[in-house]
Amino acid sequence: MSGYIPSYLDKDELCVVCGDKATGYHYRCITCEGCKGFFRRTIQKNLHPTYSCKYEGKCVIDKVTRNQCQECRFKKCIFVGMATDLVLDDSKRLAKRKLIEENREKRRREELQKTIGHKPEPTDEEWELIKIVTEAHVATNAQGSHWKQKRKFLPEDIGQAPIVNAPEGGKVDLEAFSQFTKIITPAITRVVDFAKKLPMFCELPCEDQIILLKGCCMEIMSLRAAVRYDPESETLTLNGEMAVTRGQLKNGGLGVVSDAIFDLGMSLSSFNLDDTEVALLQAVLLMSSDRPGLVCVERIEKCQEGFLLAFEHYINYRKHHVAHFWPKLLMKVTDLRMIGACHASRFLHMKVECPTELFPPLFLEVFED
């Protein structure tokens, strides 16, 4: 009989009952499929009392004669050691088959879970990188976790009365703009300090450092403001000290950019990001290899990939309960890049509409091409 033959059988091993080619270990004996089926049916249907030998129980059983005498064939099954207690009735056989199928399905699910569900956490090397980035952020993040206690609300009358009409419907309140410029220099300085605390950034050529900082500065400042969105007062806290409304930020010079930052803040409030996640977002923004004019593009790209991998593994470690947390968080990088691009365009309008003496030198140095 052809078909699957278990590996534990020797080549051409024979059935101990009839001498036909064996197919496996059945009911404690190595037998062919025919004798296995005969033995099972006999026990399940209790047929052996009905068997009768015409030749006084002395028949020789082989693969030719096995179907001629059921009594002698059954006796030989018992003689060679086939176990009647291993034969299951229909209900037990169905239960066993169901159990086998359930176990098989369980193993399939477990293997699938291992394949697609395994979420690696940071390696020792990645933990060291995460530690460096987090410490850099904490050391340069104004007011730290005490920002709510330290913040001061911009007076309501500031930023509500636009006196200069900017192009494209934007409005600039010069008093609000003046207030914002007072905190912009320390805010920019903190972004620079953050970058300079990262060894991989400091190892880059000075020209690349400048390009990266000019490219990411608004993005990182926007992120730091967005994670300090307060839904109760509907304000963002700038540089850890000045709480402003959407209208004040808009009329103070940012125009539609303020809407994007506020919307980002509202969205991020459900993410419950910790300092490490904010720090890694900043590192990813900093090491953007697509900034025009860079020399060490591949080196910067490799560095960003290292941050992204450590970041993803840290997200796995944190076990957020938001569905698709990691891809959703990565989309915020795109949002921040868009904010940076919109601000670059908005900056040109501000330069036209606001007196030059109101712009701090560092502000001009970072945002002018």
Swiss-Prot record:
Residues 1-14 are annotated as: Modulating. 3,3',5-triiodo-L-thyronine binds at R190, N239. A zinc finger (NR C4-type) spans 15-35, 53-77. InterPro entries: NHR-like_dom_sf, Nucl_hrmn_rcpt_lig-bd, Nuclear_hormone_rcpt_NR1, Nuclear_hrmn_rcpt, ThyrH_rcpt, Znf_hrmn_rcpt, Znf_NHR/GATA. 3,3',5-triiodo-L-thyronine 1 binds at H343. L-thyroxine binds at R190, N239, H343. The keyword Zinc-finger applies. It holds the Pfam family zf-C4. GO terms for biological process: cell differentiation; negative regulation of transcription by RNA polymerase II; positive regulation of transcription by RNA polymerase II; retinoic acid receptor signaling pathway; thyroid hormone receptor signaling pathway. Keywords: DNA-binding, Metal-binding, Nucleus, Receptor, Transcription, Transcription regulation, Zinc, Zinc-finger. It comes from the Eukaryota. One of its GO terms (molecular function) is nuclear receptor activity. Zn(2+) 1 binds at C15, C18, C32, C35. Its main location: nucleus. Transmembrane segments: none annotated. It is found in: Nucleus. CDD domains: NR_DBD_TR (cd06961), NR_LBD_TR (cd06935). GO terms for cellular component: nucleus; RNA polymerase II transcription regulator complex. Zn(2+) 2 binds at C53, C59, C69, C72. Residues 125-369 form the NR LBD domain. Belongs to the nuclear hormone receptor family. NR1 subfamily. This is Thyroid hormone receptor beta. It comes from Gallus gallus. The lineage of its organism: Eukaryota, Metazoa, Chordata, Craniata, Vertebrata.
